[in-house]
Curated annotation (Swiss-Prot):
Highest taxon in the source lineage: Eukaryota
Protein name per Swiss-Prot or TrEMBL: Vomeronasal secretory protein 1
Disulfide bridge positions per record: C76-C168
Lineage, highest ranks first: Eukaryota, Metazoa, Chordata, Craniata, Vertebrata
Molecular function in Gene Ontology: identical protein binding; pheromone binding; small molecule binding
Compartment annotation: Secreted
Family indicated by similarity: Belongs to the calycin superfamily. Lipocalin family.
Function comment: Transport of lipophilic molecules, possible pheromone-carrier.
Length: 182
């Protein structure tokens, strides 16, 4: 379970940097702040039903700090992590190079699509995610995301639309310790 949550959190971070015409031009002012995970598709069933807004901070060295809280089985799980940039614009590596993250700019303003694949704690995964600056559902962005998902080899029928929550208030709360990149 912890590995799955880390996968989701690391994939979210991938949205934050890209520099050529096929990706989003990076600008610290555009990315630090609040983002919303609107939808995701994975090969495996994801037990997340609610998410808080992501708080993102682009660090001076280009690395990114991300904090998000997921509601899983009526419990809150807070994840804060640092993701290191690579030499390839819009791509990141995590978990000692075993996890690859890629950003795709959506044609819908304020939306980005993420493709994540790799291995975390022995668990292989493949996932796409749709994030945006506001919590409202955008059907145009969602339709584009479904096409993106199919191009990346996933089945759009596995789409999960996530419920947004401002603050997690479950019966219990669990915080994962920060896990620095190496």
């Amino acid at each position: 379970m912890r590995a799955l949550l880390l996968i989701i959190s690391f994939c979210l971070v991938a949205v934050l940097q890209a520099q050529d015409s096929s990706f989003l031009a990076f600008n610290n002012g555009n990315f630090s702040g609040k983002w919303f995970l609107k939808a995701l598709v994975s090969e495996d069933d994801i037990p997340i039903n609610k998410v808080s807004p992501m708080l993102i901070l682009v660090l001076n060295n280009g690395d990114i700090e991300l904090s998000i809280t997921h509601m899983i089985y009526d419990q809150c799980l807070e994840v804060t992590t640092i993701l290191e940039k690579t030499d390839v614009p819009g791509q990141y590596l995590a978990f000692e190079g075993k996890t690859h993250l890629q950003v795709q700019l959506s044609s819908v303003k304020g939306h980005y699509m993420l493709y994540c694949d790799g291995e975390i704690e022995g668990m292989r995964f493949l996932m796409t995610q749709l994030i945006g600056r506001d919590p409202q559902e955008n059907l145009e962005a969602l339709e584009e995301f479904k096409v993106f998902t199919q191009i990346k080899g996933l089945v759009a029928e596995n789409l999960v639309i996530l419920e947004q929550m401002e603050k997690c208030e479950p019966e219990s709360f669990y915080e994962l310790p920060s896990r620095p990149s190496e």
